[in-house]
A protein has these predicted regions:
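Residue cluster at the C-terminal edge of the helix-turn-helix DNA-binding motif
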Residues: 62, 76-82, 122
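Short, Lys/Arg-rich nucleic-acid/phosphate-binding segment
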Residues: 53, 85-93, 97-98
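Short secondary-structure capping/turn micro-motifs that flank functional sites
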Residues: 58, 93-94, 135
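Terminal helix-turn-helix DNA-binding modules in bacterial transcription factors
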Residues: 98-105
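Extreme N-terminal segment that seeds HTH/winged-HTH DNA-binding domains in transcriptional regulators
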Residues: 2-52, 106-135
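A short alpha-helical element within helix-turn-helix/winged-helix DNA-binding domains
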Residues: 52-63, 77
């Protein structure tokens, strides 16, 4: 296991503490759970543009995870445009929060469309689906 300097976690000024819950029983990979939790915090406005979040090492310590898991999550978030890493300065939420929210909305809509397709595949028509969903 790696060394964790607990005193650093609570005394860093300006760094937003990430309250992330990990479900070890879930089939969703842990790094992906971290990604989803941070995206949710951005979508809900808990994390705002320009907020500095924990470093890879600090978040790994906070969550009791391997730093490589957090690195994979941060790399994914950076590819999605949710965060940006500035060398020697830290990791920050990007200014384009609307893009993140739109991406989350599109993801949910895609899931709903898939479920509607499943209902149609078992014989329900769109009218019946709307009625059951009370739309």
């Amino acid at each position: 296991m790696f060394f964790c300097r607990v005193y650093d976690l609570y005394f860093k000024i300006g760094v937003v503490f990430l309250n992330i819950n990990i479900d070890y029983q879930s089939r969703v990979p842990i790094y992906e759970q971290v990604v989803l939790e941070i995206e949710k915090m951005v979508a809900l406005g808990v994390l705002n543009p320009g907020d500095q979040i924990s470093s890879i090492r600090d978040l790994a310590c906070e969550l009791g995870l391997n730093p490589n898991t957090i690195k994979k999550a941060y790399d994914t978030l950076e590819q999605k445009g949710v965060i940006i890493s500035k060398s020697t300065k830290g990791t920050f939420i990007t200014d384009d929060v609307a893009k993140v929210k739109d991406g989350k909305i599109e993801s949910i809509i895609d899931e709903i469309k898939e479920k509607i397709q499943e209902l149609e595949n078992i014989g329900l028509d769109k009218k019946e689906i709307s009625k059951r969903l009370e739309l």
